[in-house]
């Protein structure tokens, strides 16, 4: 994978359970009509430190509140995460929190843990409660199947409309210690996070102080999961949980570890966009020249979220006016006279003026990316310069097709 060619980190097998100190499982509890895997469990060693980021939507599932409460109560010392897919358990009234409490209490008893050491994440159709009898019946096989090799089943069990599993693991030496990082995620539609991904989980076998780990995860999430958009909609259940366990890492290696965490998180975030409902093309937007990094991020993310930009990419239409219009709609000030735009290596605007370009070549470039026939890159690149500074931000999106409409028009019918 070219993603890691310049990194000291190497890809390995194992996914979320590749780091030491973690076990996982995934089973079919009958929560989905398809009988596919729908219940996942991740269990950590006693000394693990958990950091979580969650949806910023005012409409959110009760399991989010429970996770926040327990992370605060335990100072991040949680031991297990239960994930059910197919039912979001959001907007279900008091039953939502009651069911979350019942599920985590039952699991805590089976794992011989305290209730507050168990978290729950739910994903699926909003307004649908969890079929609790099926979930509770599925806990015994879920616990029984816990293993070091269970990461792949867990990655499958958290999926909903996803077409592919999203998991990864890497390893690298930090000093004389071999450190491993694993991750898994789910997401395909309702993707426009304002803190994390739809559901994402990360593990690491290097210990860090709580304040260091929390700050590190905030930065990692901001430049990965917060930088993607499939359809501009933020979920009620967005959750990202990151676990660090093991001997405390020497502080001189913190930066190197953060690079590894960003690699894993960026890979998972891009996988979500690549698997966007009905999507054919992953595209990357680079924005440079703003006075603040936050301004560059806002512009890049707005372009990625624009339906007009997304449909133009789907149709292989090099309509740079849509790119510029999306950038201008953010409220971030910049001088039009300093704006230059590239689609791939083709410049289409320079210092606020249109540039004559070979339209056929640009269209061919766009078609090659969509069909996977471009030898140099697997994603379409849009570059925008809006000023003279070296500040730069990147975001990722996918094209918007008629298939997306079909998938979501029929989602609950």
Curated annotation (Swiss-Prot):
One of its GO terms (biological process) is ornithine biosynthetic process. InterPro entries: Arg_biosynth_ArgJ, ArgJ-like_dom_sf, ArgJ_beta_C. Keywords: Acyltransferase, Amino-acid biosynthesis, Arginine biosynthesis, Autocatalytic cleavage, Cytoplasm, Multifunctional enzyme, Transferase. One of its GO terms (molecular function) is L-glutamate N-acetyltransferase activity. Pfam families: ArgJ. The record marks 123-124 as: Involved in the stabilization of negative charge on the oxyanion by the formation of the oxyanion hole. It catalyses: N(2)-acetyl-L-ornithine + L-glutamate = N-acetyl-L-glutamate + L-ornithine; L-glutamate + acetyl-CoA = N-acetyl-L-glutamate + CoA + H(+). It is found in: Cytoplasm. The record marks 196-197 as: Cleavage. The active site is at residue 197. GO terms for cellular component: cytoplasm. Belongs to the ArgJ family. Catalyzes two activities which are involved in the cyclic version of arginine biosynthesis: the synthesis of N-acetylglutamate from glutamate and acetyl-CoA as the acetyl donor, and of ornithine by transacetylation between N(2)-acetylornithine and glutamate. Heterotetramer of two alpha and two beta chains. This is Arginine biosynthesis bifunctional protein ArgJ. It comes from Prochlorococcus marinus (strain SARG / CCMP1375 / SS120).
